[in-house]
Amino acid sequence: MWTGSNSKDLKVLNRLLVRDMIRRLGPIARYEIAKETGLTPSTVTVIVAELLEAGVIKEVGHGASSGGRRPILLELNPTAAYVFAIRIQRGELMTAIFDLDKNIMAQRYSHLDTDLPDNVVEMIGSSFEELIEETRMNPDAILWCGVACPGLVSSHRGVVERSSNLGWIKVPLSALISKRLGGLPVHVENISNAAALAEKEYGLGRGHKHLVFINLSVGIGAGILADGEIYGGVKGFAGEIGHMTLLTENGPLCACGRRGCFEAVCGVRAVVERAKATIPAETFAEYGISKDELTLADLAFSPLANCTEAQRLIGEVGRFIGILVANVVNLLNPETIILGGELSNLGDRLLQAVKAEVEARTLEEIQKTVSIQISNIKGSAPLMGAYALALERIFSLEEWDGQRVQANWEYQISG
């Protein structure tokens, strides 16, 4: 149970405790809150009355009787506040407004030039305004913005220190987005870390304290949860497994400037380019697919995926990714590995190739305790993670009543 250094601190902590209990366990009765928290029934009654008056929670009928009157049940009011969530990826932007119960009120998906941060920030602002207009929502009801972005992210400073795939160096992204959105608080996290958090909260990672989400996209990265918390290393940059070396001689050039990285061999762009180079022109013609316009989706979902060359390529990519996963398993000894990102759409063919390599390359004692699965989160795991990060921050606030948080912003445009 939380404690405070004085009565004011204790009152605030008790309020946070009750609010979080209702959020996580609702519908729940007042007496159950008192039992779970150790607070007196009178304290719970006062706090609940305050939360009801603020519109943060609501009464939702009656529970079962244990002999007396049936207790009134409480749950979080999902429309008490909203979150603006963003996923940035090379050439793509995904934005959405969520309520407090992870329902998407409206969303946008855009293709754009992501080389210039100002272009991305402006598109974020335009998307925000379009979503507000579509939902007819008061923008002040949106309390926080969460952003999932590829690269080395100093989340405590809101700065993208380096993103090889975006071509960004030292971009104060939190401050730039906050300014464009009229002062809305913004939290930026690495895209793989965000996805790992989404898996912990909403996906296959529920109930697991030690998991690794491997994002198989344009870039390749890992979000690592150790004892239930994101593990970032000394500066928060842990998980850049796409820049581990696969080929030491004459490897392809990576966006980071080095040769032979896993990402340069197994990233989405690399796989598509290898498919263009290895699948014969007559095969493209046979399946009615333009070689120049080939996408990963063609290799995952179209009949082209069944041609001999595509099958061989997918098997090889699966083996390489399996080597990468085996290294992660031997190094971190996680409970579960979750594969996500566009390459995971290759499905069971990819998964079986990965599992075969892990079985061949990991120590038996470590191997037998790990599960390897493809993410089952509908939509975008990084977007859901951006939402979860923002939600965490909303529920750490001492007070809120559905109006814009007046935060003391530490992020500055100067970085």
Predicted regions: what they are:
Residues 83-87, 142-146, 211-215, 221-223:
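Short glycine-aspartate micro-motif
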Residues 204-265, 415:
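Glycine-rich phosphate-binding loop of actin/hexokinase-like ATP-binding domains
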Residues 1-62, 66-111, 115-141, 248, ...:
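ATP-binding/phosphotransfer module of carbohydrate and carboxylate kinases, centering on a glycine-rich
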Residues 59-60, 185-190, 224:
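General beta-strand structural signal in soluble alpha/beta enzymes
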Residues 150-152, 217-219, 343:
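Short glycine-rich anion-binding loops that position phosphate/pyrophosphate groups of nucleotides
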Residues 191, 217, 386:
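Active-site glycine-centered loops adjacent to acidic/histidine catalytic or metal-binding residues
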Residues 99, 155, 225:
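Short, acidic, Ser/Thr-enriched surface-loop or helix-capping motifs
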Residues 104-210, 349-360:
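Glycine-rich phosphate-binding loop and adjoining helix at the ATP-binding site
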